[in-house]
């Protein structure tokens, strides 16, 4: 493991300019962490976040190390409870194991009911970004503030049928909006074409409100739609099956990132 430079107070920068620490124990000054994280969120580079839901669960450490060594920017982790969506994915022990070995940003997407009950738990597990579903929150603004109070960036996910206009009053409090481009619950689904229009609408809302919110796309992302998603306003592309089912996942990540930033 590379030792952090004293100049960066515990931050190790990857080739993709990831500012998050390899060992969270090195983090002594939260104000520096927050400032660096904010700089990262305002970067113009488009980001790739492999979805661990599509990884080989029987050889998970191998796939985590592959992402660590790749040009990926974030680890995207889908947490499902079998209630909000029909599938069940990761429990806390698995998430703890992932964050222990991951050396990149931990982007957690909660597809669960009553997400407020678990905000502190996910913060303690090392999550950098915590995204909750608009459809699962009874008081969205309060949930966002609770996430930020734990030192995480606050994201809001919306299902394919949810109207962008519902974020009008909270967009300035949201660090990231995740647009589901498939119906949530299972990996490997086909891409919903109306996603392009939703990204355009969301980008227009962000600009009109003067917000700095990132747009993340989750579901069915491949080399066939990545470029157009970026062109209409996306900042972060989540790719699961396209990466992990390929013959060379690391090369697939590299090519996807190059395509997104070309």
Question: For each predicted feature, which ranges?
Answer:
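Short secondary-structure boundary segments
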Residues: 79, 110, 134, 158-160, ...
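Short, Lys/Arg-enriched N-terminal segments with co-localized hydrophobic residues
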Residues: 26-42
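Short helix-capping segments at alpha-helix termini
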Residues: 71, 101-104, 149-151, 206-212, ...
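Glycine-rich phosphate-binding active-site loops on the catalytic face of alpha/beta enzymes
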Residues: 136, 181-188, 233-252
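Conserved anion-binding
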Residues: 128-212
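Acidic, divalent-metal-coordinating active-site segment for phosphoryl/phosphodiester hydrolysis
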Residues: 220-232
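Positively charged N-terminal leader segments that act as targeting/secretion signals
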Residues: 1-24
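Conserved N-terminal beta1-alpha1 strand-loop-helix module at the mouth
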Residues: 37-131, 137-139, 154, 167-174, ...
């Amino acid at each position: 493991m590379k030792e952090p430079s004293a100049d960066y107070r515990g931050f190790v920068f990857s080739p993709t300019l990831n500012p998050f620490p390899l060992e969270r124990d090195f983090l002594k000054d939260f104000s520096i962490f927050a400032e660096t994280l904010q700089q990262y969120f305002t970067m113009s580079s488009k980001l790739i976040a492999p979805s661990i839901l599509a990884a080989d669960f029987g050889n998970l450490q191998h796939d985590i190390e592959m992402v660590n060594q790749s040009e990926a920017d974030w680890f995207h982790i889908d947490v499902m409870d079998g209630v909000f969506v029909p599938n069940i994915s990761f429990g806390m022990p698995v998430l703890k194991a992932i964050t222990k070995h991951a050396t990149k940003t931990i982007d957690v997407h909660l597809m669960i009911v009553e997400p407020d009950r678990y905000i502190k738990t996910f913060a303690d597990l090392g999550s950098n970004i915590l995204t909750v579903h608009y459809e699962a929150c009874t008081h969205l603004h309060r949930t966002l503030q609770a996430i930020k109070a734990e030192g995480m960036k606050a994201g809001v996910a919306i299902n394919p049928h949810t109207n962008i206009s519902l974020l009008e009053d909270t967009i300035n409090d949201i660090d990231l909006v995740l647009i589901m481009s498939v119906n949530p619950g299972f990996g490997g689904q086909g891409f919903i074409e109306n996603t392009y229009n939703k990204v355009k609408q969301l980008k227009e809302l962000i600009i009109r409100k003067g917000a700095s919110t990132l747009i993340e796309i989750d579901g069915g992302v491949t080399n066939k739609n990545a470029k157009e998603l970026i062109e209409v306003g996306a900042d972060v592309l989540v790719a699961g099956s396209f990466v992990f089912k390929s013959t060379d996942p690391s090369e697939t990540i590299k090519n996807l990132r190059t395509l997104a930033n070309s």
